[in-house]
Amino acid sequence: MTKDLLALLKERGLFVQANFEKELKQLLNQGSFAFYVGFDPTAPSLHIGNYVLLHVAQIFQAMGHIPHVLLGSGTALIGDPTGRMELRQMMSRETIAENTRNIKKQIRRFLGSNVVFCQNETWLKKLNYIEVIRELGPCFSVNKMLATDAFSARWERGLTLMELNYMVLQAYDFYYLNQKYGVQLQIGGSDQWANILAGADLIRRKTQKQVYGMTTNLLVKANGEKMGKSASGALWLDPQKTSPYDFYQYWINLDDASLQKVFLMLTKLDTKAIETLCNLKGAAIKEAKAKLAFELTDAIHGTKAALVAQAKSARIFAFQPDTETKTVRAGTRLVDVIVDLGLVVSRSEARRVIQQGGLTINQEKVTDVEMVLQASSQPLVIGKGKKRFVTVQVIANTK
């Protein structure tokens, strides 16, 4: 017997909560229906945290349901206050339009052609402010809005009318999509629960229809820290912003405690295979991390890129010494590092080796004698010639 969709999502750690869960389960078993996920184009690329929603959309799509992707070209002009302690910087319409085009291309890679794209600027810009106050205003309780996490955390620091209206506009998005496309379910991250419920409640008040909202877990490590952040920034899905190799290496260096969670949430491996991999002990756990790195790089960048990243990682770290990785502060000059680590005896020799092409970092030749090392989540293998290698971890300078 095929496992029902909500049970599958729960098993994979992707389900947090839903309103009217019993009724939603019945609806999912009745046949194809329309659902939506939304992304505000506040950056030129989606990141790994956004991929959780895309992966859930893929699961729904594989079971015959129709994904609608809302690109928040209108709401991005305001900015979602959720999880923020300060007012977002205003973005230009030109930047938002460019980001929207880029993100739409990215999403097509994951959802293919059987997806409906919508941009909320097309209907939000037509709203008349007086009509909004008259028609939508009575449907929202300011007391309830201020009690939500998104707003309560900002109350003492100051909350603008612009930000307060974000929830109203997102709720209206759900209402509009329900009226035009028959969308019956909104899926979002767990931090969007209040906004999702506001949309479902607006539809109930305006149409007397029951619609559904569901939230997924956010991608966080076992210690609660948000995953996908590194010393060099977010883990982007755009290969120009985060290379497939750097993406691969991020998962190679994932902490052991978070391994099973990521396998379940973001890969399609069956649970028994995941359990076997995550039960590996000691040095063998590296096999599980290599499997995770390959599976995710394959899913995001394709098999060819995953194979290239895998091969590059194997080449680089085949030279990695067995000795402990050395720690270096960001901002340290490379010539000083290789002297301190004993690869050369003096700074003049260090410069000469670099100028002659005899020094590599991760098998890439170094030519800049003035190079300064930057903080990185990935270790660096520094090599002199073909036989001498040391591994360093560059950490942020907190002084």
Curated annotation (Swiss-Prot):
Family: Belongs to the class-I aminoacyl-tRNA synthetase family. TyrS type 1 subfamily.
EC primary class: ligase
Reactions mediated catalytically: tRNA(Tyr) + L-tyrosine + ATP = L-tyrosyl-tRNA(Tyr) + AMP + diphosphate + H(+)
Pfam family, one: tRNA-synt_1b
InterPro entries named among the record's database cross-references: aa-tRNA-synth_I_CS (IPR001412), aa-tRNA-synth_Ic (IPR002305), Rossmann-like_a/b/a_fold (IPR014729), S4_RNA-bd (IPR002942), S4_RNA-bd_sf (IPR036986), SYY-like_C (IPR054608), Tyr-tRNA-ligase (IPR002307), Tyr-tRNA-ligase_bac-type (IPR024088)
Alphabetical list of Gene3D superfamilies matching this protein: HUPs, RNA-binding S4 domain, Tyrosyl-Transfer RNA Synthetase
Subcellular location: Cytoplasm
Protein name: Tyrosine--tRNA ligase
Keyword Aminoacyl-tRNA synthetase in annotation: yes
Keyword ATP-binding part of the UniProt annotation: yes
Positions bound to ATP: 229
Function: Catalyzes the attachment of tyrosine to tRNA(Tyr) in a two-step reaction: tyrosine is first activated by ATP to form Tyr-AMP and then transferred to the acceptor end of tRNA(Tyr).
Motif 'HIGH' region: chain residues: 41-50
Gene Ontology terms, MF aspect: ATP binding; RNA binding; tyrosine-tRNA ligase activity
Keywords annotated in UniProt: Aminoacyl-tRNA synthetase, ATP-binding, Cytoplasm, Ligase, Nucleotide-binding, Protein biosynthesis, RNA-binding
Assembly: Homodimer.
EC number, as in UniProt: 6.1.1.1
GO CC terms of this entry: cytosol
GO biological process, one term: tyrosyl-tRNA aminoacylation
Gene name of this polypeptide: tyrS
Extent of motif 'KMSKS' region: 226-230
Binding, L-tyrosine: 36, 166, 170
Protein source organism: Mycoplasma pneumoniae (strain ATCC 29342 / M129 / Subtype 1)
Domain spans labelled S4 RNA-binding: 332-395
Alphabetical list of NCBIfam families matching this protein: tyrS
